[in-house]
Swiss-Prot record:
Main enzyme class: transferase
InterPro entries per the UniProt record, alphabetical: Anhydro_N_Ac-Mur_kinase, ATPase_NBD
A Pfam cross-reference name: AnmK
Keyword Lipid biosynthesis: no
Record's function text: Catalyzes the specific phosphorylation of 1,6-anhydro-N-acetylmuramic acid (anhMurNAc) with the simultaneous cleavage of the 1,6-anhydro ring, generating MurNAc-6-P. Is required for the utilization of anhMurNAc either imported from the medium or derived from its own cell wall murein, and thus plays a role in cell wall recycling.
Single annotated GO MF: phosphotransferase activity, alcohol group as acceptor
Disulfide cysteine pairs (residue numbers): none
Binding site for ATP: 12-19
Keyword entries, A-Z: ATP-binding, Carbohydrate metabolism, Kinase, Nucleotide-binding, Transferase
Name the record gives this protein: Anhydro-N-acetylmuramic acid kinase
Native source organism of the sequence: Salmonella paratyphi B (strain ATCC BAA-1250 / SPB7)
CDD domains: ASKHA_NBD_ANMK
Known pathway: Amino-sugar metabolism; 1,6-anhydro-N-acetylmuramate degradation; Cell wall biogenesis; peptidoglycan recycling
Catalytic activity: 1,6-anhydro-N-acetyl-beta-muramate + ATP + H2O = N-acetyl-D-muramate 6-phosphate + ADP + H(+)
């Protein structure tokens, strides 16, 4: 069974940077050793957003973006290697999620697309890459997401305590870790995505630092109620979503009935939408003893405060309190998934995704042995 140092690479729907994490992994442990966040250039971010918003593009443009992202991921990995004074031969493999540009797991031909050419990562790092984790699950009738609940269970499951793990990235997803029950999990709806999109359009800021802008506003209750009537929130699990659904266009359509709304009030309402839509799902599943939060949204004091207020009797804390950085959780999960793939172990949970069976996930892009010598 493959064990040793693995690198996880994650570029999520928030587009707030490429998260890269180094971890020692075997069948008994996942020990994080180092991490960094690598910036995404503005032109690449724009290209990704254009695709996710349904803007037309040529196959040449898509191919160029695929190549550029692969090179960017390689740069991020090499920066971590240099920081830690490591050589390619010191790393067993890289687990790279890629950048989701479209996720449509239902319909006549379900599909999901992550770009960032893994061949370029191998070529520029000299390290074996495991990627394309989601499409096997979709081929087996699953949603292809979320994949992190299996990792949450491995690291944070408890024999007696009823726990949930909440990841607030661009999209928020919930993992239900109940003793004696199959792990369940799904996307609850928007996490940071709409808040980030609004402040970017209004203030040219990538995110609302410390929720300072949202705190200046007041929740527009009719707008909140209108958004919460979106059918996604009432749909039953398994379910997953992404930027192709909850995007700036979605927000604009809801705002047409509220001309002249104060921009700060809209930001406050979007923060409340994230908190309320999550809290509703926590309660719908019977609540828990501890809600452990990770992802960029765990650093949003307004969202965290609202979750605590909406969920009395539940301990709401970040995964940092359990010794796992909330900023690195997803990248760490894909390092772990790479280890499972190389070990021939399944990476999905049918109880989460709805797939017909558990399966080894991903595709392996082997490094040239000469570069690893």
């Amino acid at each position: 069974m493959k064990s040793g140092r693995f690198i996880g690479v994650m570029s999520g729907t928030s587009l707030d940077g490429v998260d890269v994490v180094l971890a020692a992994i075997d069948e008994t442990m996942v020990a994080q050793q180092a991490s960094l966040t690598w910036p995404i250039p503005v032109h690449l971010k724009k290209g990704i957003l254009d695709i996710c918003q349904g803007q037309p593009l040529t196959l040449s443009q898509l191919g160029q973006l695929d190549t550029q992202l692969g090179r960017l991921f390689a740069q991020a990995v090499n920066a971590l290697l240099a920081q830690q004074r490591l050589q390619p031969r010191d790393i067993v493999a890289i687990g790279c999620h890629g950048q989701t540009v479209w996720h449509e797991p239902t319909g006549e031909a379900p599909h999901t697309l992550q770009i960032g050419d893994n061949n370029h990562i191998v070529a520029h790092t000299g390290i074996t890459v495991v990627g394309d984790f989601r499409r096997r699950d979709i081929a087996l009738g699953g949603q292809g997401a979320p994949l992190v609940p299996a990792f949450h269970h491995a690291l944070l499951g408890h024999p007696t305590e009823k726990r949930m793990v909440l990841n607030i990235g661009g999209i928020a997803n919930l993992s239900l870790l109940f003793p004696g029950q199959a792990v369940r999990g799904y996307d609850t709806g928007p996490g940071n995505m709409l808040m980030d999109a609004w402040i970017w359009r209004q203030c040219a800021q990538p995110y609302d630092k410390d929720a300072a802008w949202a705190k200046e506003g007041q929740v527009i209750l009719p707008l909140l109620q209108k958004m919460l009537r979106d059918p996604y929130f009432a749909a039953s699990a398994p379910k997953s979503t992404g930027r192709e659904y909850f995007n700036y266009g979605w927000l604009e359509r809801h705002l047409t009935a509220f001309p002249g709304a104060d921009a700060r009030d809209v930001q406050a309402t979007l923060a409340e939408l994230t908190a309320v839509s999550i809290a509703q799902q926590v309660l719908l599943n019977g609540g828990c003893e501890r809600l452990m939060v990770c992802g960029g949204g765990s650093r949003n004091p307004l969202v965290m405060a609202r979750l605590a207020a909406l969920l009395p009797g539940i301990e709401v804390s970040t995964t940092d309190k359990a010794g796992i950085s909330g900023d690195d959780m997803e990248a760490l999960a894909f390092a772990w998934l790479a280890w499972r793939t190389l070990a021939g172990l399944p990476g999905n949970l049918p109880s989460v995704t709805g797939a017909t069976e558990a399966s080894v996930l991903g595709a392996i892009y082997p490094a040239n042995p000469i570069t690893q010598s």
